[in-house]
Amino acid sequence: MLVHTDYLWFNTKKRQEFVRITDEIAAIVKTSGVAEGMVLVSAMHITAGVFVNDWEDGLIHDFQEWLEKLAPAGLDYRHHQTGEDNADAHLKRTIMGHQVTLPITAGKLDLGPWEQVFYAEFDGQRRKRVVVKVMGE
């Protein structure tokens, strides 16, 4: 079995931001030499996530509004009693998930016609990374 590991780095301009990373993942898969297998894409920070969905501006906006209703910024969360101020980011990351596993077929990502991979930042404006681990034959 072949295993190839790479990293994507992010430093978003906004506190909350969704970044489409499908092309970057596809490029890593291509250079890995894996023809049949899977790729794990995992955010390596507790206030960031990775998810798969449609790349449509209205839907991205809907996600942001929905998450803000579920875990509003600025509330007096217990986590803030420890000196932190980002409990909402932890909650949003938990809702959206921190990793995805994607199929590789014939050396390419095997996604549905509308599926795209996103990095979700919920406490941004600092350097963070995503691990991309390609495994297979």
Q: Residue ranges of each PLM-predicted region?
A:
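Active-site histidine-anchored catalytic micro-motif
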Residues: M1-E137
